[in-house]
């Protein structure tokens, strides 16, 4: 396909559909809209103000905000001004913010919708100027209007070449310090043009943006997808208004992650208990009414493409949603391959597989069954880390994902684990913890899980409780957990069978450094946090332990 930059697509819609609504954002309960012409005007103005600063070309300019219209406007203005955008996760602590700003060598920081800017701002180095998005009152920042008032907009249609660096996207750091993934304009164009065509998306589609735009999946699907298609994006105002915002927006395309699907399931079961739901689904007429009502309640009644990604979604959860009329299509990709690897199409779904490769994408298995990917959208490398960049690629140019997989005779890929997560028990057998963790997803009392076992006789599962679990008595939890463990052990090999389930009172969050901003688990941090208890737990004859005197 012919190269088309994100800027060229903005100019196209500014010219061809100036009055069509591009962005919709609820502010204080009222919807605000921006047409393509209005977005382009704001982008041109901000780009002019950025150029007036006299920064060297290709300077690194960071953004930190929850999703909103001005996140996209700011991103486009940065690249129009000739610079490189550095999107930062909006839910990080001050020390993490400081680390990424220093690693990225950012010269400027835009600050938008945040819950804890007053705590976070301590991590901003003194030499970095901060500019606030509109509709935000961020202390210590120059206001949007003040920054823009004195400078002329850019009126010409500036272009950026395919090989230029567009953005540095920092990985969430589940296994150590975050790495800056360098992505070119060619990567953004190649992935978006191929993916949207393969998925059959058009300008009539509607996106709903709530997962962080700083994450590559949301950015490619929602920001780049809408930009290349000329489609509409609606935002969620807050967690409290999420349900109202999505039902009002009626998205045709929706991207979820494991945790969101679990929350949706818990919300449905809180209104319709599983036994009652089972009975209703067995009666055809009632079943159809129930399915329609559930989809409408979720805001997915108009959705034709429902995706899940970022981390594996358990088979049981996918099957549960399919049974109630929500067909979820699995996908698989990483930041380093610009969110372009494998996708499940609706007409050919295999539960437990993440589909076949996208067009113009090669996927193969290397040593240790490592999944390796090659296409024109791969990263240039990790910023200022040449050794890690060299390690990330094979000699023939494939990106080494670090994930393990299996490819069946039809070309479908199944993720089986992560090479670095494998541990060896005292019996000398290797265990893939993620495969065991996935089995917990069908049990409604569990919110989070991490399987440990390096050097132990048998693996253990550390779990936190869901709202359903927290409402149960200690003895009921003990009984349910014991049954749950027996059921799982029946399907596991002898060396994989769980010896203990440890019920933790402490939840794992970004604030206590046990979750990264992507909300996966920081396995190493969790293991270190509870390591002092391992010997006592292993020697105990009790199968179900409660920590911190839970309940």
How should each PLM-predicted stretch be described?
Residues 33-37, 166-192:
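Conserved AMP-binding A3 loop
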């Amino acid at each position: 396909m012919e190269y088309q930059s994100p800027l060229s697509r903005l100019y196209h819609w500014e010219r061809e559909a100036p009055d069509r609504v591009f962005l919709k954002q609820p502010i204080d309960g009222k919807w605000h809209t921006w047409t393509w012409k209005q977005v382009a005007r704001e982008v041109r103005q901000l780009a002019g103000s950025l150029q007036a600063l006299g920064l060297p070309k290709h300077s690194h300019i960071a953004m930190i905000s929850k999703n909103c219209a001005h996140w996209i406007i700011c991103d486009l203005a940065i690249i129009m001004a000739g610079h490189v955008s550095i999107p930062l996760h909006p839910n990080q602590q001050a020390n993490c913010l400081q680390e990424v700003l220093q690693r990225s060598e950012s010269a400027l920081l835009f600050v938008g919708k945040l819950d804890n800017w007053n705590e976070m701002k301590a991590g901003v180095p003194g030499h970095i100027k901060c500019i606030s998005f509109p509709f935000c009152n961020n202390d210590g920042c120059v206001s949007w209007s003040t920054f823009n008032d004195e400078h002329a907009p850019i009126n010409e249609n500036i272009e950026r070449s395919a090989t230029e660096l567009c953005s540095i996207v920092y990985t969430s750091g589940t296994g150590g310090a975050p790495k800056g993934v360098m992505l070119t304009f060619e990567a953004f164009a190649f992935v978006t043009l191929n993916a949207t065509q393969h998925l059959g998306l058009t300008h009539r589609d509607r996106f709903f943006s709530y997962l962080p735009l700083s994450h590559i999946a949301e950015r490619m699907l929602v920001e780049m997808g809408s930009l290349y298609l000329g489609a509409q994006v609606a935002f969620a105002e807050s967690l409290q208004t999420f349900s109202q915002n999505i039902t009002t927006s009626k998205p045709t395309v929706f991207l979820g992650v494991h945790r969101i699907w679990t929350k949706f399931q818990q919300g449905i079961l809180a209104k319709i208990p599983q036994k009652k739901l089972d009975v209703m689904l067995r009666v055809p007429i009632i079943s159809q009414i129930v399915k329609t009502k559930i989809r409408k309640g979720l805001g997915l009644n108009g959705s034709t493409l429902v995706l899940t990604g970022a981390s594996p979604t358990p088979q049981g959860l996918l099957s549960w949603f399919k049974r109630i009329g929500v067909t979820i299509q699995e996908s698989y990709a990483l930041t380093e391959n610009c969110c372009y690897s494998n996708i499940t199409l609706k007409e050919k779904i295999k539960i437990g597989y993440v589909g076949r490769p996208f067009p113009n994408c090669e996927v193969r298995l290397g040593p240790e069954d490592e999944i390796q990917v090659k296409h024109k959208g791969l990263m240039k490398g990790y910023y200022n880390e040449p050794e890690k960049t060299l390690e990330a690629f094979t000699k023939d140019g494939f990106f080494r994902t670090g994930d393990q997989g299996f490819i069946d005779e039809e070309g479908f890929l199944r993720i089986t684990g992560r090479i670095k997560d494998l541990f060896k028990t005292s019996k000398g057998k290797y265990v893939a913890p993620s495969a065991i963790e996935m089995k917990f997803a069908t049990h409604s009392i569990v919110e989070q899980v991490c399987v440990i076992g390096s050097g132990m006789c048998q693996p253990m599962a550390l779990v936190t409780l869901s709202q359903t679990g927290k409402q149960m008595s200690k003895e009921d939890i003990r009984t349910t957990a014991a049954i749950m463990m027996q059921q799982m052990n029946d399907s596991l090999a002898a060396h994989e069978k769980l010896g203990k389930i440890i019920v933790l009172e402490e939840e794992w969050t970004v604030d206590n450094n046990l979750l990264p901003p992507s909300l996966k688990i920081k396995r190493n941090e969790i293991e270190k946090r509870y390591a002092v208890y391992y010997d006592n737990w292993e020697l105990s004859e009790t199968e179900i332990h409660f920590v911190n005197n839970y309940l």
